[in-house]
Amino acid sequence: MGSRSSTRIPVPLMLTVRVMLALSCVCPTSALDGRPLAAAGIVVTGDKAVNIYTSSQTGSIIIKLLPNMPKDKEACAKAPLEAYNRTLTTLLTPLGDSIRRIQESVTTSGGGKQGRLIGAIIGGVALGVATAAQITAASALIQANQNAANILLLKESIAATNEAVHEVTNGLSQLAVAVGKMQQFVNDQFNKTAQELDCIKITQQVGVELNLYLTELTTVFGPQITSPALTQLTIQALYNLAGGNMDYLLTKLGVGNNQLSSLISSGLITGNPILYDSQTQLLGIQVTLPSVGNLNNMRATYLETLSVSTTKGFASALVPKVVTQVGSVIEELDTSYCIETDLDLFFSRIVTFPMSPGIYSCLSGNTSACMYSKTEGALTTPYMTLKGSVIANCKMTTCRCADPPGIISQNYGEAVSLIDRQSCNMFSLDGITLRLSGEFDATYQKNISIQDSQVIVTGNLDISTELGNVNNSISNALDKLEESNSKLDKVNVKLTSTSALITYIVLTVISLVCGILSLVLACYLMYKQKAQQKTLLWLGNNTLDQMRATTKM
């Protein structure tokens, strides 16, 4: 296969803006129309928004791990809080030590700085091997060093507050939000209730909740046992640590509600621990999230193919899996550079490939330009549901209607059958019963036939078979050629020499000249003979007239 030319769009922020401005000049168009393609076995399964991103925004979240109890309930919760505090220190001290080692590696100036940095990273990695991702994480950790130091200056005030969420701004170079999942629990359970609780019940409630949170902490930091501080935390881990308070930071950083679910699903929001203070039980995490640009006039359209019936057997259409359309331009979209969610595609760069005129014409609705590859496998998908209806190849499988009862037949030469509630309310296919609620309106093309010229060979076995047929044809041609050669061998070569041919040509020319002269001479003699006949006839008539005149006298 030859290499394909591609359209590449990198994603520096300025270029992102330029791309969006350029595309905004294109008039919006509807998505790829799948109605004329469905009966040809090409099904448009859905569209997704196309976004480009670059990781550029950061913010800090300071997690208050140890809650402040109300004064009148401190004694009741003292025992579980002390046990919880000891467990926290044991669990997170390796993380804090790793962070300090990496951050202190930049204290040396000159050429020793890089060496100490790599040494600190290697020292925190099992087997002494640091990956590129770990080095990147360590570099980000060092860049956040000053911010972490400023947060530690405010640790006493952060630890003393009873607020579950509040902003920390003094001396910080980026947005920081202090949150406390356990503080939220204490506030909800004890500070905002007038109900009197006995000490045993308070101890039990606090102990159970702290144990649950410890379990979450262990789950979050379990992968960091071998390389503390160098493993990124996922958005799920951040939510486990901060609870619903995480939304406050994301909103402050500019993440809208319409994008939040897609960004969470994409995994583009990550966090790196930047500090841990065992005295106040504060855990600082730098959160990185992308700057996302939505290309409003560009969408990704997903295509699926069914095995259709042709006179050459079963075949599937040769079309891309994903295409994108901007204005009147349709190109294949490479999704290997993207992160996919239910509704969106997030690209670090956009790569498209131009399509051949035949495929372009096919996807534009000209089904006679579609090309198909033979697929005679028994497991090839012969049916697909679409908006409450079914597109099925009833030549490959038995299409049974339960309401009204009957077998749905497919006409000869018809590629697939479009089955909706107008033709069948309850549809049974391969043991699966479906109640149809959709309808194929008049805009859907039906009764499409695939011509023999549209079916080509692409599979290895089919190509081998075709090559065998070609070899047989070549063998037959060689036999005919050999027979012709044997006949030519019987020809007298002397008679076909150059001099003999020249002699034949000269004699032929002389014969033609003689023939022409003979013909001219014959014509002349005939003309002369006719003239003599006319003269004799005139003389005879004249003599007869004279004799008649003499007789009368």
From Swiss-Prot:
This is Fusion glycoprotein F0. Residues 1-31 form the signal peptide. Residues 142-170, 466-491 form a coiled coil. Belongs to the paramyxoviruses fusion glycoprotein family. The record marks R116, L117 as: Cleavage. Residues 522-553 are cytoplasmic. The chain crosses the membrane at residues 501-521. It comes from the Viruses. Glycans are attached at N85, N191, N366, N447, N471. It is found in: Virion membrane; Host cell membrane. InterPro entries: Fusion_F0_Paramyxovir (IPR000776). Homotrimer of disulfide-linked F1-F2. Disulfide bonds join C76-C199, C362-C370, C394-C399, C401-C424. Pfam families: Fusion_gly (PF00523). It comes from Newcastle disease virus (strain Queensland/66) (NDV). Its main location: virion. Class I viral fusion protein. Under the current model, the protein has at least 3 conformational states: pre-fusion native state, pre-hairpin intermediate state, and post-fusion hairpin state. During viral and plasma cell membrane fusion, the heptad repeat (HR) regions assume a trimer-of-hairpins structure, positioning the fusion peptide in close proximity to the C-terminal region of the ectodomain. The formation of this structure appears to drive apposition and subsequent fusion of viral and plasma cell membranes.
